[in-house]
Regions:
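Non-catalytic pre-domain segments flanking phosphatase-related domains
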Residues: 1-25
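Asp-based, Mg2+/Mn2+-dependent phosphohydrolase catalytic module
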Residues: 3, 8, 121, 133, ...
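Active-site neighborhood of HAD-like aspartate-dependent phosphohydrolases
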Residues: 17-61
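A metal-dependent, Asp-based hydrolase signature
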Residues: 44, 64-101
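An amphipathic alpha-helix signature
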Residues: 38, 53, 57, 77, ...
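Short, acidic loop-to-helix structural element flanking the phosphoryl-transfer center
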Residues: 77-78, 95-132, 142
Length: 242
């Protein structure tokens, strides 16, 4: 698809035609590369770096869903650590306290995707209001934003921690309209996670799916309003709707 944007069928006319006034970004996988932790994992466990990063992310997300459905909240930091412990057990790795600490600390300084900083600066220069809306708890988000040199670009770091649940619970998505004092269709919700884009679309956002991996759309009876391959494609989408 490249820079061409796919406006999808099956959305409300309001979401399709709304003037965009703000953007809410998912953090992990969208702004920050969760698989970049695999580089350190490879050094600590040679030959296992990719497997660790893949399974760790899978369990991290699975645990947020299970805890949200069951009302058993733990912070995203704790859930991330639990996912790492499971991953080590599943792969038969000796996860010492020092290695666990090193990998967890790396999660606070994940690599940003290469185009992201320039895109964020472009949007800010266009007068677009921006915030992060994430499963991450506040200390994690603050550390990641600082490490990625994104400080000063966002009005707010909106965390699920205040409602003690996780995406795709509707209460989480309500943070965007509540913060910006805008209707959901006036806000572009940006995520690289197809399930997150689906949840935000159900809520009523104008959704933009950053489909970096070229995955098919989740089969949930709903599609994101638009799709691009990188965050660079978002700029064109927002410009056309301001």
């Amino acid at each position: 698809m490249g820079a061409a944007l796919a406006a999808s069928a099956g959305h409300s006319a309001l979401a399709q035609g709304a003037k965009i006034k703000a953007v809410a970004f998912d953090a992990y996988g969208t702004l920050f590369d969760v698989y970049s932790v695999g580089q350190l994992a490879e050094k600590l466990f040679p030959g296992q770096g990719n497997a660790i990063s893949q399974l760790w992310r899978t369990k991290q997300i699975e645990y947020t869903w299970l805890r949200a459905m069951s009302g058993q909240y733990r912070t995203f930091w704790e859930v991330t650590e639990d996912g790492l412990v499971f991953t080590a057990q599943r792969l038969g790795l000796d996860l010492t306290d020092d290695k666990k600490r090193a990998l967890m600390e790396q999660y606070n300084k994940l690599d940003p995707f290469p185009e992201n900083l320039e895109v964020l600066k472009q949007l800010k220069g266009m007068g677009v209001r921006m915030a992060i809306l994430s499963n991450g708890n506040p200390p994690m988000l603050e550390a990641a934003v600082k490490s990625a040199r994104m400080e000063g670009l966002f009005e707010a770091l909106l965390s699920v921690d205040s409602v003690k649940s996780f995406k795709t619970v509707p209460e989480v998505y309500r943070f965007g309209p509540d913060h910006f004092k805008l209707s959901a269709p006036e806000i572009v919700f940006v995520s690289s996670n197809g399930w997150d884009a689906a949840g935000a679309t159900w809520f009523g956002y104008t959704t933009f799916w950053v489909n970096r991996a070229g995955n098919p759309t989740e089969v949930l009876g709903v599609r994101p309003v638009a799709e691009g391959k990188t965050l660079t494609d978002l700029v064109e989408f927002v410009k056309a709707r301001m």
